[in-house]
């Protein structure tokens, strides 16, 4: 029997990029997967590929195509998961959660000809990319889905300390996300649950390609990264799954760089 049998990983943003890679990696390690994603008909074929890969690993998979930042949908997923795990006799077995929601406003602060960022843009970006981590964590704890031994991870970026054109609102949200991780790490210590941020290197994902300056970013990293390549989602997924073990109980409140040394060379 696998030591991971009966464990579940909740992946927010499970259909592409870091979320999809981490869902696949957890599945290969024997974890069951609950995925939350928001996709339209045009990208559902890619979602089905992720689901099929998880099933091929011989584990259970439940995907929800909803807005993870919607309170009603979140409550519904939590309730359905409580019922599912209770039926299986696996209460309290959501052992890991990855917050990998990449949806925010990419606009200049000062009108550059394409319009300036608005209060609604700021609010949406903060709610999706930072605050939703807290809401999901609250519900996991209060519902009893996650208990002692739980591991919470959230994807951050070097945008917390670098300026990228039109990335200001996301930089703000990622900085807040890291603050949320620190606060959760302290508050969850008495629950035996850890919380850490994962700072990936520049990765060629759909989210990156929405940034206007992404071609220059890719060129700069290819020239400067000590390994001579970009980070890929599997690099990050392997680290997250490796860390989701009892031996990392003393590792919490950190920002863990997974970038091949990219950030330290500028």
Stretches found by the model and what they are:
Residues 26, 188, 243:
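Aromatic pocket-lining residues of Rossmann-like dinucleotide-binding sites
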Residues 225-236:
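A conserved structural motif in NAD(P)-dependent oxidoreductases
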Residues 194-204, 244, 257-259:
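Conserved SDR Rossmann-fold cofactor-binding beta-strand/turn motif
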Residues 240-241, 252-266:
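Short C-terminal tail/terminal secondary-structure segment
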Residues 102-190, 202-203:
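Catalytic loop of short-chain dehydrogenase/reductase
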Residues 2-96, 103-120, 210:
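Short-chain dehydrogenase/reductase
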Residues 98, 153, 195-198, 208, ...:
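Hydrophobic structural elements of the Rossmann-like NAD(P)H-binding subdomain
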Residues 46-49, 166-169, 190, 202-225, ...:
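A glycine/serine/threonine-rich, flexible loop-to-helix segment
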């Amino acid at each position: 029997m696998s030591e991971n049998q009966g464990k579940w990983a909740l992946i927010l943003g499970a259909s592409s990029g870091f979320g999809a890679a981490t869902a696949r990696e957890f599945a290969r390690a024997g974890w069951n997967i609950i995925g939350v994603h928001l996709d339209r008909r045009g990208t559902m074929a890619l979602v089905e590929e992720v689901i099929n890969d998880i099933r091929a690993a011989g584990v259970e998979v439940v995907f929800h195509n909803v807005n993870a930042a919607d309170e009603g949908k979140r409550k519904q997923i939590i309730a359905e998961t409580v019922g599912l795990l209770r039926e299986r006799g696996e209460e309290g077995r959501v052992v890991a959660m990855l917050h990998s929601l990449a949806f925010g406003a990419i606009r200049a602060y000062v009108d550059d000809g394409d319009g300036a960022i608005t209060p609604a843009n700021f609010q949406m970006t903060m709610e999706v990319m930072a605050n939703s981590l807290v809401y999901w964590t609250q519900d996991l704890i209060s519902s009893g889905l996650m208990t002692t031994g739980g591991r919470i991870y959230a994807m951050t970026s070097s945008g917390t300390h670098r300026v990228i054109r039109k990335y200001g609102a996301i930089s703000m949200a990622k900085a807040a996300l890291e603050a949320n991780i620190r606060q959760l790490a302290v508050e969850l210590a008495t629950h035996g649950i850890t919380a850490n941020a994962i700072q990936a290197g520049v990765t060629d994902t759909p989210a990156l390609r929405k940034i206007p300056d992404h071609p220059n970013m890719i060129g700069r990293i290819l020239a400067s990264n000590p390994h001579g390549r970009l980070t890929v989602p599997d690099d990050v997924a392997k680290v997250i799954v490796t860390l989701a073990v009892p031996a990392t109980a003393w590792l919490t409140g950190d920002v863990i760089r997974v970038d091949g040394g990219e950030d330290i060379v500028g």
